[in-house]
Amino acid sequence: MTRVIHTGDTHIGYAQYHSSVRRQDFLDAFAAVVDDAIDDGVDAVVHAGDLFHDRRPALSDLMGTIRVLRRLADADIPFLAVVGNHEAARGGQWLDLFERLDLATRLGDEPTTVDDTAFYGLDHVPVSRRDTLMYEFSSHDASYATLVAHGLFEPFAHADWDTKTVLEESDVAFDAVLLGDNHTPGRAEVADTWVTYPGSTERASASEREGRGYNLVRFDETAAAGDDRVEIRRRALETRPFVFVEVDLDAREGEPAVRERVRQHDVTDAVVLVEVTGDGDPITPAAVEAFATDRGALIARVSDRRTVETDESVDVHFADPESAVRERVESMGL
């Protein structure tokens, strides 16, 4: 039996909303995953890419990541990972550095065996280079095999990578495909193989409303009642609260109504995102944002989705270029 944590899209170094606090949140979320791994005594932590938000992470982000990985190494839990599109560099990868420090293993076409499971890796590959991609992997003698990859795979949203093609053209039969890139968690069965995303560990955009987390994956003959050999369970992470305030104003309402809607929520230490729709009077987003931060919000952003109509019409006339030049020359007495 092999038990691993499957995570990805940690985006360490992302100063969301230009906030140093949010930047630390992304590192803290990764540290929380490692804490759980150590507490649970899993056999490995598998990271499916985009460990960093940028290919040039700041020194503080690198040092913070190394500190977290050292705790994992001290607990004798291997960190297995692939390279995502956000962090991919033209030369050597940061993951290679961590491997030289004995803090990580970069997965590839050779198997990395943990207990009775062989792990393979597929870094992010741009769409333009996939036509010539060969899904060739070295053989293994483990009981189970898993592919870890980064990209937008079918049948999930925004897909541009055919999962069935990968599985059918691969010379290794995989029991599971552990993915990264799509920040929405999901699970599906493709060609009798479980394919899953754990989602991001922190909210990297306003569209990521659901709670964050990771997957706990078990490879065992008794997994999933003995039928599938693979059991995938989702586990939640406690992260920075986001408060979504949706305000649909009627014709007689304005900024006071928006403030009242904000007042109805506990915004302490939260990222507050206010969306205004409907009719009503104009509002001043900065004033509403200040109101939210005065009530304890870490960050507040207001989006006014209403279309402002005006009865005024503006006529735009374009001057003839040659006439404009002649007039300018004459005015200069040339």
Which sequence ranges carry the predicted segments?
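Amphipathic, non-transmembrane alpha-helical secondary structure
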Residues: L27, A31-I38, M63-I66, M134-Y135, ...
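His/Asp/Glu-rich metal-coordinating catalytic cores
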Residues: A44, H53-T196, S200-G213
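N-terminal active-site segment of His-dependent metallophosphoesterases
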Residues: M1-M63
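Accessory, non-catalytic peripheral segments of nucleic-acid enzymes
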Residues: D227-L334
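Glycine-rich phosphate-binding loop signature in dinucleotide/nucleotide-binding domains
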Residues: A37-G41, H140-A142, V267
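A conserved active-site cap/scaffold subdomain adjacent to cofactor or substrate pockets
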Residues: G180, R187-H265
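Conserved residues at the C-terminal ends of beta-strands
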Residues: A48, G180, T277
